[in-house]
Amino acid sequence: LALRHADAPPYTYHPGSEDKRITAVIDYMAAHLDANISLDELATLTGLSRFHLLRVFRAATGLPPHAYFNHMRLRRAKRMLFDGSSIADAAAATGFSDQSHLNRHFKGMWGVSPGAFIANLDQTSPKIPK
């Protein structure tokens, strides 16, 4: 169940008149999960002002760009942990400064630390005899 929802978008995207620009922002975020993306960078990408981008992005996705980006990063980190990556590798690959930074955000989103998530996977995964 956790895996099924790990890659689901955090909120439904409702295309509107700015849909190509919002899609471009989301695609850019997905391609740069390990980077520190600024609102100015996204505004330049779309040709919109920072404030207009904030308004249309939030109207389309339900979240401001930074929160949406953090959700994307956390879903990727969760997938990596599920696939067997270490917490340090997941943190580095998803742009978190260190394991502690990932831990705070991960726990805030799912209510458990990455270590507890991994431990739960170990308890629920079928054991393969050697």
Please identify what each model-predicted range represents.
Residues 53, 57, 101-102, 106:
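Short hydrophobic/aromatic patch on the recognition helix
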Residues 1-30, 40-41, 52:
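An amphipathic alpha-helical interaction segment
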Residues 113:
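Nucleic acid-binding interface residues in structured DNA/RNA-binding domains
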